[in-house]
A protein has these predicted regions:
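Conserved beta-strand segments of alpha/beta enzyme cores
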Residues: 6, 27-29, 77
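Catalytic beta/alpha-barrel core
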Residues: 7-12, 30-32
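Donor/substrate-binding cores of folate-linked one-carbon enzymes
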Residues: 11-14, 24, 41, 56-172
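Short, charged/polar "capping" segments at the starts of alpha-helices
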Residues: 16-20
Length: 172
């Protein structure tokens, strides 16, 4: 089913999704990180986010590490979708990492961000089976549906106040 949610805005650090987002009458803002420190970029990003006062912030295709000040400003409100079954294959190119290891399952993880890369409290995960015939690209294509499902389920839990965070774990 559909999520009962209002997307207040999409904020990216590249302008490449503007046209797509604006087709849905959703405001798009580009807050470039070029020439800025992580702290400077985080401050500009937070200022733009705060204009909308969202309940939650979703990181999807946002491939930048956010600074501790940004993380502290939005505790347990920033949800990241990572395209692996964490804690396996942290960081960039997890499908390539999975392919190189010859895994038999791939997955996706939605988690709250913290100051450690891809190590925040896990909200939702799911996996699918793969085999030796899958290339890294085939894994990536197969994983897209898993990522969408995991993110939507995590958002549904968050929006219905069904997540309790204790230490670095969640109870849902």
């Amino acid at each position: 089913g559909a999520l009962d949610v209002e997307i207040a805005a999409v904020i990216g650090n590249h302008d490449n999704l503007r046209e797509l987002v604006e087709r849905f009458d959703i405001p798009f803002h580009c807050v470039s990180h070029e020439g800025l420190t992580r702290v400077e970029h985080g401050k500009l990003l937070a200022e733009k986010i705060d204009e909308y006062a969202p309940d939650y912030i979703v990181l999807a295709k946002y491939m930048r590490v956010l600074n501790p000040e940004f993380v502290a400003r939005y505790p347990n409100r920033v949800i990241n979708i990572h395209h692996s079954f964490l804690p396996a294959f942290i960081g960039a190119k997890p499908y390539q990492q999975a392919y190189e290891r010859g895994v038999k399952i791939i997955g996706a993880t939605a988690h709250f961000i913290n100051n450690e890369l891809d190590q925040g409290p896990i909200i939702m995960q799911n996996v699918i089976n793969v085999d030796h015939t899958y290339s890294a690209d085939a894994m990536m294509r197969a994983g897209r549906d898993v990522e969408k499902t995991v993110l939507s389920r995590a958002l549904d839990l968050a929006l219905h106040d069904r997540i309790f965070v204790y230490k670095n774990k969640t109870v849902v």
